[in-house]
Amino acid sequence: MDGTRTVLDIKEYSDSEVQKNRVLTLEEWQGKWVTGKTIFHQEQGHQLLKKHLDAFLKGESGLKVFFPLCGKAVEMKWFADRGHSVVGVEISELGIREFFTEQNLSYSEEPIIEIPGAKVFKSSSGNISLYCCNIFDLPRTNIGKFDRIWDRGALVAVNPGDRKRYVDIMLSLTRKGFHYLLAVLSYDPTKHAGPPFFVSDAEVKRLFDSVCNIRCLEKVDALEERHKSWGIDYLVETLYLFTEK
């Protein structure tokens, strides 16, 4: 019956090319931190991650977990507190400093020799290292490989024209037996230019299907009052789990 339809039944916008030429510069991203326009930050952490944490971690301990475009994600502290080693990358030094301050963590900083002007910030406990640099420069560092990747607010923030390059870097960082958890957003991209950018199911398959098993864990209605200022009337968040083929 039509009366039982929800936003999750809305047919996904079919043209993933609408935003393909949209570009946000690194300076614009840094400006969002300076002006406090960081509504993408979730102070309580990500609810779908909490719900599917067991599927992600599989009961394993001592994992190495990567947070691309990490901002000041509180989940980094969650994983560190559970005995895992956390590495993140973020272009905003302000965002990184805010993370350590808000989590009451002491830290040190040192230059990244391979990337002029870049720094790495390390918690005094040694289990959180946050690289302040362009994520596309990351392959120049000896950052190692990861058991887990938590990609929330990263793929949807990367300029659409850079997605393939970004995904290639992410997959190059994975260890055998990896689990990669990805959250993406679906809405009408003719009504909102992004970021966050619209990422379709077909796009996810195009980017990951050749090397990953793809499992859709959940789709949820993510529309909040603040999103209506974007001009959209629906927003669906989809959580995917990728594993090694």
Swiss-Prot record:
Q: What is this protein called?
A: Thiopurine S-methyltransferase
Molecular function (GO) terms for this protein are: thiopurine S-methyltransferase activity
Cellular component terms (Gene Ontology): cytoplasm
Q: Which Pfam families match?
A: TPMT
Q: Which organism is it from?
A: Equus caballus (Horse)
According to the record's subunit comment, the protein's assembly and interactions are: Monomer.
Q: Which family does the record assign? A: Belongs to the class I-like SAM-binding methyltransferase superfamily. TPMT family.
Residues bound to S-adenosyl-L-methionine are 29-40, 69, 90, 152
Residue(s) carrying N6-acetyllysine:
K58
Q: Which gene encodes it?
A: TPMT
Q: Where is it localised?
A: Cytoplasm
Query: Would the keyword Cell inner membrane be found if you checked this record's keyword annotation?
Result: no
Alphabetically list the UniProt keywords: Acetylation, Cytoplasm, Methyltransferase, Phosphoprotein, S-adenosyl-L-methionine, Transferase
Its chief place of residence is cytoplasm
